[in-house]
Amino acid sequence: MAVAENAGVKVDSSGQNLDNNNTAASATETTKPPCPDDDQSPKSDSSTPLTIDSTPETDDRINETAQKVQTLNGFSGNGERDNNGEIKDLADAFSKLNPMAQEFVPPSLARSQSGVLRNGLGFTNNFAAPPKLADGNDHFPRRRRSFGQGKRRMNKRTSLAQKDDVIRRTVYVSDIDQQVTEENLAGVFINCGQVVDCRVCGDPNSVLRFAFIEFTNEEGARAALSMSGTVLGFYPLKVLPSKTAIAPVNPTFLPRSEDEREMCVRTVYCTNIDKRITQIDLKGFFEMLCGEVHRLRLGDYHHQTRIAFVEFAMAESAIAALHCSGIVLGALPIRVSPSKTPVRPHFPRAEFK
């Protein structure tokens, strides 16, 4: 009967024939040649997971193997990085460095290294800091410097443009007679345009003088060039385009009140004074030719020649002193012009004997 024939068959819960499977497995083992690498452990494929019975011996063996692997990889038994492994990694990294290579410094820090960076490190409050924090501020210092440089460049360009404009409005006048004052010279050029400033200067290598005249516009300066050859005093003037602007007078030296303006009328400015001339000599020279000297200020000895401010008691004496320009005092001809600044008594007035 079919029932009797199937009675000896073993069937598991999945309906597979275990006896047939065992028979097939044993037949395969007898026919398959032994592999030298085979450790006689059961093999598993992708469909059947490998299961190992957990025993105290297998657990100890697995832990021992894992510790050996971690030790070889540079980790200690508790999973932390081993010092020997770190030293080995550092030694390998340093062995790859070029000892002849130059230190790299970013361009943004090159200008700020002096006095701040030492041996590639910056120090803030006695602590080593990264180079970007060496100045104590990490808020984009490079961008801040670039803004400041741009502002300075803009201010410099603006000042240069303004200076060039002033130069184009200025003429240079030479061969000016010693008797010609700034008022006389400005009156000659008033027909060319409105005069902003007129500055007469002495030439130590000549008995003549030169001057700079600034106009309100370039048209006045161009018209002034046609005045070259005009006789003023005893000599014809030479007028050329100026290469420099008139230096402004320090406003702190200008008169601050009506009394100081009245003092300027009575004061003359003297240049090209012999260094051997003393204050007493200069005072006696002007009092003999012009009148009483109220106050006198003589410059220092640090230059080749000296300057002086002479304030007279009367305005008529100051006008007379202008005619003394060119007279030899000591070994040099003295230059006299109206003063734009008063003589302020910063210290007690010197006693003249």
From Swiss-Prot:
Q: Which SMART domains match?
A: RRM
Using the record's annotation, list all stretches that form the RRM domain: 169-244, 266-341
What Gene Ontology terms describe where this protein resides (cellular component)? nucleus
UniProt keyword list: Nucleus, Repeat, RNA-binding
Q: Specify the domain of life of the species encoding this protein.
A: Eukaryota
Ranges of Low complexity composition bias in the record: 20-31
The name this protein carries in UniProt is: Polyadenylate-binding protein-interacting protein 10
> Which gene codes for it?
CID10
